[in-house]
């Protein structure tokens, strides 16, 4: 069982749609699997948290993938999630770390870079995909997701993300919020929201203080204004498997498979998302080859 979960809520009589998430254990699982250093952990954790909350907007078997590519030293940050609270992610260069920035925080912007884009691909079923992209504005990721919603999905939003890392590289706290203004929202509501967000304590500090996702929303929106709709358990989950990789090997073609048999006497594949390794024997590859022929 995981302690991580996502909260879905409405506020101010439906003028505001809100999500918040506690992701400490999910991000710890990613940190353990990928051996990420603190700055990389923060970048990956923030991206996973945002992706998880975006996944909570989906239905049924729909899923989405987020790719952040700012041309920075960390390379790409990739996460995907579904409507059921499953999330996974990885970074190209997990051993990326820098001294704290001028604000005494992990320098995520320096690791991610700002010369690039945030891309979202939603798999909405029936081989139907929605793709949206926006330029990175700060590389800190919260601002970048906020800008993505405004630019690509035309929904005024505020995204706050935070990850705190312990001296031993383990994850101390991780979570975030995603608040969206619905069509027809009153100016007074929008002004209240902007004022609250501008004056709030950083997300990672609030989570570190023990605030639950519900309390995080109460802090921003006022408890009396919030209607909690649903809680969804969240966890790091990878859907890779032996058969999936065997299928991928099949796609390489006969010559490449024959090469694996002759030269390597088998094959090994590693999943980018969870680093599980899969072994394929000569016999298995030969059988695959026979089936293709």
Swiss-Prot record:
It comes from the Bacteria. It is found in: Cytoplasm. Keywords: Chaperone, Cytoplasm, Disulfide bond, Redox-active center, Zinc. One of its GO terms (cellular component) is cytoplasm. One of its GO terms (biological process) is protein refolding. Disulfide bonds join 238-240, 271-274. InterPro entries: Heat_shock_Hsp33, Heat_shock_Hsp33_C, Heat_shock_Hsp33_N. Pfam families: HSP33. GO terms for molecular function: protein folding chaperone; unfolded protein binding. Gene3D superfamilies: Hsp33 domain, HSP33 redox switch-like. Coiled coil: none annotated. Under oxidizing conditions two disulfide bonds are formed involving the reactive cysteines. Under reducing conditions zinc is bound to the reactive cysteines and the protein is inactive. HAMAP family: HslO. Redox regulated molecular chaperone. Protects both thermally unfolding and oxidatively damaged proteins from irreversible aggregation. Plays an important role in the bacterial defense system toward oxidative stress. Belongs to the HSP33 family. This is 33 kDa chaperonin. The lineage of its organism: Bacteria, Bacillati, Bacillota, Bacilli, Bacillales. The gene is hslO.
């Amino acid at each position: 069982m995981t302690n991580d979960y996502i909260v879905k809520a409405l506020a101010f009589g439906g003028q505001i749609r809100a999500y918040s998430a506690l992701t400490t254990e999910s991000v710890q699982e990613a940190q353990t699997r990928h051996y990420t250093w603190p700055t990389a952990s923060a970048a990956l954790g923030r991206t996973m948290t945002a992706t998880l909350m975006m996944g909570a907007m989906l239905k049924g078997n729909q899923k989405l993938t987020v790719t952040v590519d700012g041309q920075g030293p960390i390379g790409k940050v990739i996460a995907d999630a579904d409507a059921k609270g499953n999330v996974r992610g990885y970074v190209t260069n997990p051993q990326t770390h820098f001294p704290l920035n001028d604000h005494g925080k992990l320098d995520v912007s320096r690791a991610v870079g700002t010369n690039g884009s945030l891309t979202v691909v939603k798999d909405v079923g029936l081989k139907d995909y929605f793709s949206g992209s926006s330029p990175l504005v700060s590389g800190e990721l919260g601002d970048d997701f906020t800008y993505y919603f405004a630019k690509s999905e035309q929904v005024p939003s505020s995204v706050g993300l935070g990850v705190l890392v312990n001296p031993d590289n383990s994850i101390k706290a991780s979570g975030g919020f995603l608040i969206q203004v619905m069509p027809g929202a009153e100016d007074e509501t929008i002004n209240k929201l902007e004022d609250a967000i501008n004056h709030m304590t950083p997300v990672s500090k609030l989570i570190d203080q023990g605030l639950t996702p519900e309390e995080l929303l109460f802090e921003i929106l006022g408890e009396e204004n919030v209607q909690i709709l649903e809680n969804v358990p969240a966890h790091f989950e990878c859907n890779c498997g032996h058969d999936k990789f065997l299928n991928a090997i099949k796609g390489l073609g006969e010559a490449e498979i024959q090469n694996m048999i002759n030269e390597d006497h088998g094959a090994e594949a590693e999943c980018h998302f969870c680093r599980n390794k899969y072994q394929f024997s000569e016999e298995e590859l030969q059988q695959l080859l026979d089936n293709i022929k």
